[in-house]
């Protein structure tokens, strides 16, 4: 019974919704926050069909702390608008966010987008919930056949107390090189407040399976990790381990609605 429970929880954990190759996660063994079009909304501009995605994320292996995400994208002509609702936390601590995104494809190699989110935080002992907001522009371009450059920034008004909110600014620059049909190499730089974090790693792809390895060079606590993804019948399964974050796992489901994307003349 114990092993059966572990197997069930393994299947129902983190969010790794299956994606096209151009929007696949650049995260390497859970050491990167630059991932997919749920984060950097500019990637959603490349979608060809309406997509509905559902996923569950477990931050630590078999822990209470988890996140549920519902995401839907509507591509039309060169413009894609998306909506996301996510709930993070456990019974005594919860963060709820609702996000709307807009992305435009300027050329087949370049897209930009912006998203705005409303944040609501509540914990046991607080009389009322605390709220904030987040604005996040994103951009990506292929400046050579297999060279992808992506930029992403966040401006967050985070609730600290009922009387005080704090503005937090962060920016990410990521470079991805497709070495061949099997191997992708990614490098990322993150700046938040006065902290600088560098990340790098690689992904090895074999049809529906991919292996990720990488390292994070943080000023105080460097870390390394590895993980894998499996895509099958519009499901996506993922698990990864990071030396500073522990083991995380995920399950995602994506439904494509077979409408054709029409382009304005």
Indicate where each model-derived feature is located.
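Sec/Tat signal peptide C-region and signal peptidase I cleavage site
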Residues: 14-18
